[in-house]
Amino acid sequence: MKRIDELYRWLLRPPTDGPAATLLLRLMAGGVFLSEGILKFVYANQGVGRFTKLGFPWPAATATFVGGLEIAGGLLLLAGLCTRLIAVPFVIEMIVAILTTKVALYLGTSPLPLPPAPPKVGFWAVMHETRSDWAQLLTVGFLLLAGPGRWSLDARLSASAKRGR
């Protein structure tokens, strides 16, 4: 039970005294996840169509779930609320994205359209195509470890809770 309490505190009561520049990373990651989530609903080829081509089970449900997660989670990151908690599914999502799309690209077996600029397959194609995946993965990894920073709703709520004691 003690470990569960520690995990709860670590996820939902993160340190809020980190560098102010954490705000920039939160805004970048939150903005990218939010816009990518919206795109999954606006453009079928980015949502259901993409998950269908990749062979995901229940592509409509998967696209709806992932798109909804990205919209809600992106808004949470932008606000700096539950930052560590939402970073966990985002880390998992980005690892799955890299494994399901970029390994096949490397091997030249991707069901998705090839990148518009050479090279089309192999190491350098993967390096080009994974740039945003890596940026998102490393950003939410940072936020998972560092917390939301002092300019966040988590910091305001933490300060309010301390004043209320």
PLM regions with names:
Residues 45-57:
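Short juxtamembrane and helix-loop transition motifs at transmembrane-helix boundaries
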Residues 1-42, 60-68, 72-165:
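Extended, low-polarity transmembrane helix blocks
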